[in-house]
UniProtKB/Swiss-Prot annotation:
Organism per entry: Methylobacillus flagellatus (strain ATCC 51484 / DSM 6875 / VKM B-1610 / KT)
Pathway(s) served: One-carbon metabolism; methylamine degradation
Residue ranges of the TM segments: 5-25
Cell compartment(s), UniProt: Membrane
Upper classification of the organism: Bacteria, Pseudomonadati, Pseudomonadota, Betaproteobacteria, Nitrosomonadales
Protein name: Methylamine utilization protein MauD
Gene: mauD
GO molecular function, one term: oxidoreductase activity
The entry's keywords: Membrane, Transmembrane, Transmembrane helix
Residue span(s) of domain Thioredoxin: 50-184
Topology of this chain in the membrane: Single-pass membrane protein
Any Gene Ontology biological process: methylamine metabolic process
Highest taxon listed in the record's lineage: Bacteria
One term under GO cellular component: membrane
Amino acid sequence: MTSGIMIASNVLLWGAFLALAALMLGVIRQIGLLHERSAPLGAMMIDHGPDIGERSPVFSMTTIDGVPVTVGRAVSPGRPSLLMFTGPSCPICQKLLPIIRSVAATEGADVILISDGTQAEHREFLRNHPLDGEHYVVSAEIGMRYQVSKVPYGVLLDKDGVIQAKGLCNTREHVESLFETTRVGHSTLQNFLKHGVEDASKHVH
């Protein structure tokens, strides 16, 4: 009789343990989903151009002010480069310019603004938004090579011209995420969050 009671108790304990484990797994998954929905999403990759980890194609260009610049390699030795695809009539690009400048200064990166359109449009844009150390290049070719379909779109290159991160950038968080992904070791912050949830689920098992 005592043996039967002990067996029943063990069965109940194991049942309670498994139920608790299943509940914890469900909670972890819900937290992950909530985190993805509530946290500012990182820059979204929407192009099909050169991949992260590949060396950037190189373009010998001249800035709108007539200064030669090589797009795809370090502007300053030892410093990363942020290629930001913009448009002179893009309101988000105009709002984002001081943010790009601030984040790049914090991260020690050179900024190359790459745009398309008429010279008149660019001159008007620059009258309203003067440059402050950024390189401004007018080129449809670079955007086509990277297959950028929407702006503002950022591509972060390391000091050797290797693509570290890229994605659509509509907010400060998006711009910052280009640099943050290199620190967390994932191509995008979405990928980092996804792997974090999966790793937590494995620990429960």
